[in-house]
Amino acid sequence: MVRIFPPRSIACWSEKSLAGPRSWSGLAEHHMSLGATLSVDYATFFALLRGICRSLVRHGFRQVLLLNGHGGNIAALTVVVNELAVEFDAPIATTTYFVLAQPAIAKILETQGAVRHACEAETSMVLALVPELVDMSLAAEAVGPTAPELRDIAGTVAAHRWQSFKARTSHGAIGDPRTASAEKGERLLQASAEAVARLITNAEFWKLPA
């Protein structure tokens, strides 16, 4: 879904901006136990983003936002941005759309407070974008766990340890897709795009001293 937000976000405001191509792979080791996953290691992830940011800075871009749509990238992107902003002496930032827009997302969803995995939210957004990929007659078979330990992404924890998705869910889903709808997906997409647009146009955010 993250490929959708830059064009939508740019459409929300009139100043000049460019949306670059999305990176097709990221850090997904936690999904490897479920199969059909392509993941890269941190060194590759960092090298790719470093090359992209270096190119943009050399071409005169004054602000760079690395927009993320995958939970497995969040921790690494913080480190990437910290290192590249210093190396290139440029305002390089990152955000994850479903964390940035979480307050608005929570108001739209019925069965969960944030985006999870193949859930009410993600299924709704896919229904809005490529409905031919979704067979809602099978939704009942794709209901995933909603145990308390599976906290909302936007929550906080005081400690962390790595855990594979297979330890959490037998089929990869976390959440309940049965209440998903294309109408809800369109609202989620628009709310997320608007949140990204507000960040892009937040002059104070970009003027923060390094």
Residues covered by each model-derived region:
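Extended, histidine- and acidic-residue-enriched regions that form the cofactor-binding/catalytic faces
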Residues: 1-65, 71-210
